[in-house]
């Protein structure tokens, strides 16, 4: 059994404000796969404050910096692909083949799609004597379901990062 009892906030693994845990049950075996920390409103506030502070710098990052980040993310994802699939199998009880081919594959697919769009995206578009500028909006709050965990996270995180937003 593995325990994931910290949150990654402001570049560091931190303890939750209130130490409360939840068991993760593998629905295929009904075995406890691990425990996770449960967040509170205070934890969310800390994460939002950190994301807001990071927004000022990230929103001003260059296209080249964002492309480089996505290239590094994709390379790291490929290195950990088997681990991702194994975690999906364990935490949601998905058959290994489904976790490997569909679940883990969809996550990297969203990163690759965002990178492809980012390389050709026009953040500035002249229209006659006017310039339309598309800018990052701020901190994005991303709520994802459990049934396609990597897919639902990646399809929200990838575009947010690509356009210069931070997220919680």
Q: What are the residue ranges of the model-derived segments?
A:
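Short linear capping/connector segments at secondary-structure termini
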Residues: 87-95, 102, 125-129
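Conserved catalytic core of two-component sensor histidine kinases
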Residues: 45, 105, 154
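Conserved hydrophobic/aromatic pocket- or pore-lining residues that grip, position, or stack substrates
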Residues: 66, 88, 111, 140, ...
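Secondary-structure boundary/capping residues
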Residues: 60, 82, 86, 97, ...
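Conserved small-residue-rich beta-alpha loop and adjacent elements
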Residues: 122-168
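Long amphipathic alpha-helix in the N-terminal Rossmann-like dinucleotide-binding domain
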Residues: 71-82, 94-120
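Short, structured beta/alpha segment
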Residues: 1-90, 112-113
